């Protein structure tokens, strides 16, 4: 059930229309976004673990420790359906590029591929020997990559459900896996303190990113253009890396992240921001270039474990743990 938020009159009056002269092709990043709470989505009965917008922008998928996936309208927060079948809690969910399929990663040691329109499980991917924690489709959506507490990364064939490769990737649980934009590379992160880049075709490790220190790496993803890698570590830090040079370019701090694997995002529909949840129950938004905190979103009553940015609109989805169990949709003018 989604509940709408009323906008105070004064706030609406402050939102002046932008003069048309500034409507150039490549807009400079505005000073600050103005994300405001629009909807609160309630339905999960345990901690929410992950939220992801469909690539076509229509839907939001959420996964939870309650073993369920829920689908919601991306623009109105309207509940659409529940997808069930896992025996234990789900840590992650991801969409195929055509927005027709979902893959989920569960503590029951399996991944499942779902047809979203029917809610049917098409394939169960078996092979990991411990909790499956993270998953993603490649852009072509013929492959799935998964990471597990068994310390391995696996590459799966979507059509057959067979495991094509098992990478002995890390020496501790794998916290995140992500393909770059042409699917040729995979980045993985782990509690062992490493970020590794893999050649998808051969399964070879091409690069290991190491900084001075090596706190557990709790999340990683490629930037939309594939040149950079955003990595979160459990010392309250997000870092932007130049992948080819193996150099850290930017550091984002001010949030709290010492315990949980919290998702982070590149927001590119308006200004260029970095977005992350936090253990102080807030959503943090940084200016990507200047590294300044430009907004903090207040409303959740527990750790904000997951955030997602809409593919075309200035919309953020956020989700929180056990004491909250809700998903919130926020919208900004820039």
UniProtKB/Swiss-Prot annotation:
What are the N-acetylalanine sites (modified residues) in this protein? 2
Keywords in alphabetical order, please: Acetylation, Chromatin regulator, Isopeptide bond, Nucleus, Repeat, Transcription, Transcription regulation, Ubl conjugation, WD repeat
The UniProt feature for the cross-link Glycyl lysine isopeptide (Lys-Gly) (interchain with G-Cter in SUMO2) gives its location as 7, 27, 46
Site for Important for interaction with histone H3, residues: 107, 133, 263, 322
Mind telling me which GO cellular component terms the entry cites?
A: histone acetyltransferase complex; histone methyltransferase complex; MLL1 complex; nucleus; Set1C/COMPASS complex
Task: Give the matching Pfam families.
Answer: Beta-prop_WDR5 (PF25175)
Does Metal-binding appear among the keywords? no
In the UniProt record, the signal sequence range is: none
Question: Sorted alphabetically, which PROSITE patterns does this protein's record hold?
Answer: WD_REPEATS_1 (PS00678), WD_REPEATS_2 (PS50082), WD_REPEATS_REGION (PS50294)
Regions of compositional bias (Basic and acidic residues) in chain numbering: 1-12
* InterPro entries registered for this protein in UniProt: G-protein_beta_WD-40_rep, WD40/YVTN_repeat-like_dom_sf, WD40_repeat_CS, WD40_repeat_dom_sf, WD40_rpt
| Stretches with biased composition (Polar residues) | 17-28
Tell me where in this chain the PTM N6-acetyllysine is found.
112
Functional summary from the UniProt entry:
Contributes to histone modification. May position the N-terminus of histone H3 for efficient trimethylation at 'Lys-4'. As part of the MLL1/MLL complex it is involved in methylation and dimethylation at 'Lys-4' of histone H3. H3 'Lys-4' methylation represents a specific tag for epigenetic transcriptional activation. As part of the NSL complex it may be involved in acetylation of nucleosomal histone H4 on several lysine residues. May regulate osteoblasts differentiation.
Q: Return the similarity comment.
A: Belongs to the WD repeat WDR5/wds family.
Q: What protein name applies here? A: WD repeat-containing protein 5
What is the scientific name of the source organism? Bos taurus
Lineage of origin? Eukaryota, Metazoa, Chordata, Craniata, Vertebrata
